[in-house]
Amino acid sequence: MAKPTVSDAQLMIQIAQWGTSLGVEEAMPQLFADDFDPDTANAMDNPAVRKMLMFGESIATLTKNDLLSKKLVNDWLWIEGIWSRVGPAALKQRARFNEPRLYENFEALAASAT
């Protein structure tokens, strides 16, 4: 895995700013609350799940295409932990729309981090 570059760090900061404007910092506590059930969560009904799926898939797409360092992302975010909370909702959306590409990059990044 290539060493992260200054460009990777700059992009990471931009993504962090985008995450702030999306409301990622409000979504995360909801996803990790004791009363949140990943198995019953629905991306269509839960804004926190939707935000984190979009955020995670965007970051994962950048890493997949070598536009952002996977090493840097895994040092920054607990991708597999986030996926464990929103992944079941993503899989339901895949099945509902019969579209295997939905959130595939996020899932792959989470799997590669373990």
Locations of regions flagged by a protein language model:
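Acidic, Ser/Pro/Thr-rich low-complexity regulatory regions
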Residues: M1-T114
